[in-house]
Amino acid sequence: GTGQQAGTDSGRMKDGSDFIGGGSYGQGHWRFPPEHRMLGYAYILTHPGVPCLFWPHAVRMPDGRHGDMAAEVATMVQMRKNAGIVADSPVEILIAESDVYVARVRGSNADVTVKLGPRYDFPKEIMPAEGGREWKMCASGKDYAIWSRPHPTRA
């Protein structure tokens, strides 16, 4: 691999916007697969760039649709804010294989590690505890998990 984020040719996500569509725009030719929407949100909300949320996925609709999705998206948005992930935050791809992708993003307040794909076994050394700072699970679901760890406090 190139060590660049998926879907980029320059690795400069600050110059673009990420979007998970619901298919109610245009003719729906490039509809994001509904069964993978949360994987998509786990990616765009943990990685550098400018995430763009599809409104019906971000709020519970009056008829109750998307309630669980909206709650999980809100959790990920809050994690992104708390970690201080912005358009040009550094990202390091730790594993990129056919059944698992693991990356670490350095926000201004915390590091975030995201795992995408069906495989859950990866080397424990990828997420070591350092100086008493443990990784905390922020969100998880079918084929994704997100952890964060605050930066050391400065005296």
Regions found by a protein language model. Give the residues of each.
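Carbohydrate-interacting/catalytic domains
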Residues: 2-155
